[in-house]
Amino acid sequence: GMMHACGHDAHAVIGLGVAEVLMKIKDSLHGTVKLIFQPGEEGAKGARPIVAHGHLDDVDYFVGTHIAPTKGPDDGDVTPGTWGSLATSKYDVYFYGQSAHAGGFPENGRSAIVAAANAVVNLTAIPRHSGGISRVNVGVIRGGTGRDVIPDQCMMQIEVRGETTEINSYMDEQAKRICHAAADMVGCRLEMVPEGSSESQHSDE
């Protein structure tokens, strides 16, 4: 009875509806029409492979749409020139420390969870950008094997967003700096694996 309904079901229906209409009038069309259903949209990993595989090499015009949560299902409005989607960068962040017995030899340990916790607190403290919308989120954090073991590994899934590509770059740089500093503070090794990114877009007509 629950779903992540941010529009993908509606977008698929819109695309199929457009395909049905175009097939009915195909004899009056001149040129080629491509319908693109972007894979991996939630992780911002789908558009680049489409471009890299040449699917857009011969495309002259690109028309896209996105449903709006502010409109009801019966409004039937189409609004051009809306503000664009946020640019984003997404990372899997890995902290590697040193395991030790928390009761017997804590001085021998370097807690990956402590490093991650420092990162979480300070990521949320990144000053928001005065030039537009900026966002940061830690959506997943996992680590540790037992209450008496100083954990040698911890991972986080994080993302930053910005109203413009420049604002997102600001958030991205701050997030990287904070994660590296959090690891250094505890003596951990850090690995940040990019898991998707996209630039901002604005519709002007």
Predicted regions and their residues:
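Ordered, soluble secondary-structure elements with a strong preference for glycine-centered loop motifs
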Residues: 4-5, 106, 165-170
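Alpha-helical transmembrane segments that form the membrane-embedded catalytic/substrate-binding core
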Residues: 11-15
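Generic recognition of short, well-ordered alpha-helical segments
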Residues: 17, 45-49, 107, 170-173, ...
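Flexible, small-residue-rich helix->loop connector segments that border functional cores
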Residues: 17-30
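Alpha-helical structural signal in soluble globular domains
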Residues: 18-21, 53-54, 174, 178-182
